[in-house]
C-alpha cells in the first residue's frame, strides 16, 4: 500500500451534484464519497489536473444555466496518510428500511419478512439514502402493481426500477449516462429481476404509453421533459416526480397542474409529488 494519497474536497449545490458525479465517473474517478455536505475524491495519483477540469466544468454549467453565483465552493486538494479506504467506505454505508422495503449492500445481511433490495453502491449513483429516493420508495410501495407497464426515468443505480419489478411491474429504464444503465442492469441481476427494456437516453426514445412513471431527477430536467413525460402517460397513469428542491415546487406544480395531484411529501428541503393522469378540461 502506498504511504500517501491525494484528497480533493468540494461542496456543490445539491441539484447539480449528480452532474459532477457523472463528470468524475466519466474521467475515470472511482473513489468518490459524499460526506459533510460535500464530495470527497481520493486517488494515489495527483488530482491537480482533475481539480482544474472540475473548475472549468463548473464554469460551463454556470454559463449554461445562466447563474450569477458559483456552483461549487470550498474546493481543496491535500496530501494525506493512506488508509484502507475500501473498508472505511464499507463501514460508513448503513442499510435503510422504508416501510417493508429493505435496501442494503452486497456485503450486508438480508432482513427477514421484507422486500430486500441488494445494491452495489460502488457501481454508480447512490444506495438509497437520499431523501428524494426515500420518498419514491414509499410511494412505489403504494402504487406499484403487477402487470403495470412502468418506466424508471433517470434510473441511476436502478433501485426504483428494481422495486417496481419486485412488485410485478413490467419495467423499462433509461438514463443519459451509459454507466448508470450498466450499473442498473448489474444491480437487477443481483436482485434476480429483469428489465424489459433499457436504453441510454431519455424519455423521447420511449415507445408507447406507461401506467407508471417515476422520475427522480432534478427539477430543471423535469421541467424540460414535461411534455414528453405527459405524452407517454396512459389514461389514469401514475406519475411520481422527485428530486425537487422546495424552492422549485411551485414551478413544478404549475407545469403539471393539468394532472391530478393525489399525494406529496417533503423531507427536509426535498419535495416529491404523485400525479394521476386525469387531465383537467
Swiss-Prot record:
Entry GO CC: cytoplasm
Sequence positions that bind S-adenosyl-L-methionine: 133, 154, 175, 216
SUPFAM superfamilies xrefs: S-adenosyl-L-methionine-dependent methyltransferases
EC number: 2.1.1.-
InterPro entries: Ribosomal_L11_MeTrfase_PrmA, Ribosomal_PrmA_MeTrfase, SAM-dependent_MTases_sf
Keywords tagged on the record: Cytoplasm, Methyltransferase, S-adenosyl-L-methionine, Transferase
Catalytic activity annotation: L-lysyl-[protein] + 3 S-adenosyl-L-methionine = N(6),N(6),N(6)-trimethyl-L-lysyl-[protein] + 3 S-adenosyl-L-homocysteine + 3 H(+)
Plastid listed as a keyword: no
Top-rank taxon: Bacteria
Pfam assignment, any one: PrmA
Enzyme class, UniProt record, top EC level: transferase
GO biological process: one example: methylation
Gene Ontology molecular function, alphabetical: protein-lysine N-methyltransferase activity
Subcellular location: Cytoplasm
Function: Methylates ribosomal protein L11.
Family: Belongs to the methyltransferase superfamily. PrmA family.
UniProt-listed PANTHER family: ELECTRON TRANSFER FLAVOPROTEIN BETA SUBUNIT LYSINE METHYLTRANSFERASE (PTHR43648:SF1)
Protein name: Ribosomal protein L11 methyltransferase
Gene name for this UniProt entry: prmA
Amino acid at each position: 500500500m502506498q504511504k500517501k494519497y491525494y484528497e480533493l474536497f468540494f461542496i456543490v449545490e445539491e441539484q447539480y451534484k449528480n452532474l459532477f458525479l457523472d463528470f468524475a465517473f466519466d474521467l475515470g474517478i472511482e473513489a468518490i464519497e459524499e460526506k459533510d455536505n460535500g464530495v470527497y475524491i481520493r486517488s494515489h495519483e495527483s488530482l491537480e489536473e482533475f481539480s482544474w477540469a472540475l473548475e472549468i466544468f463548473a464554469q460551463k454549467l454556470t454559463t449554461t444555466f445562466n447563474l450569477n453565483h458559483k456552483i461549487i465552493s470550498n474546493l481543496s486538494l491535500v496530501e494525506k496518510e493512506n488508509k484502507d479506504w475500501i473498508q472505511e467506505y464499507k463501514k460508513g454505508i448503513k442499510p435503510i428500511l422504508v416501510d417493508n422495503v429493505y435496501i442494503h449492500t452486497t456485503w450486508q445481511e438480508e432482513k427477514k419478512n421484507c422486500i430486500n433490495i441488494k445494491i452495489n453502491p460502488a457501481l454508480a449513483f447512490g444506495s438509497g439514502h437520499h431523501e428524494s429516493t426515500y420518498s419514491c420508495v414509499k410511494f412505489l410501495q403504494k402504487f406499484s402493481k403487477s402487470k403495470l407497464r412502468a418506466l424508471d426515468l433517470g434510473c441511476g443505480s436502478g433501485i426504483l426500477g428494481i422495486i417496481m419489478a419486485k412488485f410485478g411491474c413490467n419495467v423499462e429504464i433509461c438514463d443519459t449516462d451509459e454507466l448508470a444503465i450498466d450499473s442498473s442492469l448489474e444491480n437487477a441481476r443481483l436482485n434476480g429481476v429483469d428489465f424489459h427494456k433499457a436504453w441510454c437516453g431519455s424519455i423521447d426514445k420511449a415507445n408507447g404509453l406507461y401506467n407508471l412513471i417515476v422520475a427522480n431527477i432534478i427539477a430543471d430536467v423535469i421541467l424540460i421533459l414535461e411534455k414528453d413525460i405527459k405524452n407517454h402517460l396512459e389514461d389514469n397513469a401514475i406519475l411520481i416526480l422527485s428530486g425537487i428542491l422546495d424552492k422549485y415546487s411551485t414551478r413544478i406544480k404549475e407545469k403539471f397542474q393539468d394532472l391530478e395531484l393525489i399525494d406529496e411529501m417533503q423531507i427536509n428541503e426535498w419535495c416529491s409529488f404523485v400525479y394521476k393522469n386525469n387531465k383537467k378540461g
